[in-house]
A protein has these predicted regions:
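Conserved donor-binding/catalytic core segment of Leloir-type glycosyltransferases
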Residues: 189-207, 213-216, 231
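Membrane-proximal helix-turn-helix segments that form the acceptor-binding/catalytic region
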Residues: 97-108, 116, 122-126, 132-155
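Nucleotide-activated donor-binding/catalytic signature segment of Leloir-type glycosyltransferases, i.e.
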Residues: 243-270, 275
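A charged, aromatic-enriched C-terminal amphipathic alpha-helix characteristic of glycosyltransferases
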Residues: 19, 329-336, 343-378
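Nucleotide-sugar-dependent
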Residues: 18, 207, 264-266, 277-301, ...
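N-terminal subdomain of nucleotide-sugar transferases
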Residues: 1-46, 82
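A conserved mid-protein helix/loop that constitutes part of the nucleotide-sugar donor-binding site
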Residues: 22, 26, 204-220, 240
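Carbohydrate-associated surface elements
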Residues: 161, 175
Length: 379
């Protein structure tokens, strides 16, 4: 069985990274299902871990210097990199230390195939909304990317690019663990008087949830028979701006902020909401035209919840009846149209089961990574 080192510079000790953690663990499981023996590299705060089927190697660091030294090469003293035929790297803001790590790996094991996942490309637009420190890290990443071609064999991307940094790409899109994100059955009951929208995200500007709040403000200025409630679930840099917008429009009765939810609390939220709100602001980072595939859309599909998006997602057929597409611009969302969309889709017999079945057949990580596995095995 071929050995694969799955390398991610992600702190799984932070609760708010739960969504990304779920994705990475599902990818790891998919590679195992596809016949690889996977060793998983990650960290929890100051403890760096390499997890195999048989054991977990833990290395606790006491200083930032010691942490970086081990993260970007020190761990090679504790494993036999020569035993691995493949390495899968989840992209992060790289730096010259990472390039040195790749150099060290290739020097000790020239035959190893290294693939890096860069989901969205170009990704630089995402950092226009981040802190100065993050923007400086981006500059370091752009410098380091000049050396990717020397050590990285393929880029795995959800974009349409055939080459990234001069490296051939493998095109796929986001998948999901349909066992973990199971169907909500029965779906939330609709009494004809209330509709509940679910905005579940790591709150960032490109999710465009402000467009729903602006739409609710317009909607509530006219007397309506159906009350619409918007539930915000998650944390992130944009959350305070959304709260301020709610206060500005005096919508605290209709926009409910729940913070981070998981487990039974999240299941309950899904079972009481009718429509999922996907990403509505991808145009803000130049990623609305088939260049991305949001995890959240796949979760809504697996859960059996009709949803709204503002970008092209090639993971779904063009006339998929359970997606409501809105224009990718800054206009407020028309709440009346969402109500109509929900009434039409919820009238389809067993709509939630139909959505879940599509997810099981087309959106699993095993299906999405099969081509990656084949490329690893190509001689």
């Amino acid at each position: 069985m071929e050995k694969l080192l799955f390398y991610t510079k992600m702190n799984f000790g932070i609760e708010a990274t739960g969504g990304i953690k779920n994705k990475v663990l599902a990818q790891k499981k998919a590679f195992e299902d596809l016949g690889f023996e996977v060793d998983f590299f990650y960290f929890e705060n100051k403890v760096i871990k390499i997890e195999s089927k048989q054991s977990i190697l833990e290395h606790k660091t006491e200083s930032k210097f010691a942490f970086l030294k081990y993260l970007f090469g020190g761990f090679l003293n504790d494993i036999s990199i020569e035993d691995y035929s493949c390495m899968y790297v989840r992209h992060f803001l790289t730096n010259p230390m990472f390039i040195f790590l790749l150099y060290s790996i290739k020097k000790r094991n020239p035959q190893i195939k290294i693939f890096m996942e860069i989901p969205t490309f170009p990704y630089q637009f995402e950092f226009n909304y981040f802190s100065l420190i993050k923007r400086l890290e981006l500059k370091s990443d752009l410098f380091s990317a000049n050396y990717f071609k020397k050590y990285i064999d393929k880029i795995v991307t959800f974009s349409s690019k055939e080459l990234i940094y001069g490296i051939p790409t493998i095109r796929t899109d986001n998948g999901i663990d349909t066992d973990k994100f199971g169907i909500i059955d029965p779906p939330a009951p609709f009494n004809g008087k209330e509709i509940h929208l679910l905005g579940l995200a790591n709150m960032q500007k490109w999710h465009g949830l402000d467009r729903v709040i602006e739409g609710l403000s317009t909607y509530n200025k006219i007397s309506k028979n159906i009350k619409v409630y918007f539930h915000l679930v998650g944390r992130g840099d944009e959350l305070q701006n959304l709260i301020d917008l709610v206060d500005k429009h005096k919508l605290s009765e209709y926009v409910l902020v729940h913070g981070f939810l998981s487990g039974k609390a999240l299941e309950t939220m899904f079972s009481t909401c009718h429509v999922g709100i996907g990403s509505l602001g991808m145009h803000r980072i130049n990623a609305a035209k088939g260049e991305t595939s949001a995890l959240k859309s796949r979760e809504f599909a697996s859960r059996g919840m009709p949803f709204v998006i503002g970008y092209q997602d090639r993971g779904f057929p063009e006339k998929y009846p359970f997606i409501f597409d809105v224009i990718a611009d800054e206009t407020p969302i028309d709440i009346d149209s969402i109500i109509t969309f929900y009434k039409v889709t919820s009238a389809i017999p067993n709509f939630n089961k139909t959505m879940n079945l599509y997810a099981q057949e087309h959106l699993t990580w095993r299906a999405k990574l099969e081509n990656v596995a084949n490329n690893f095995r190509d001689k």
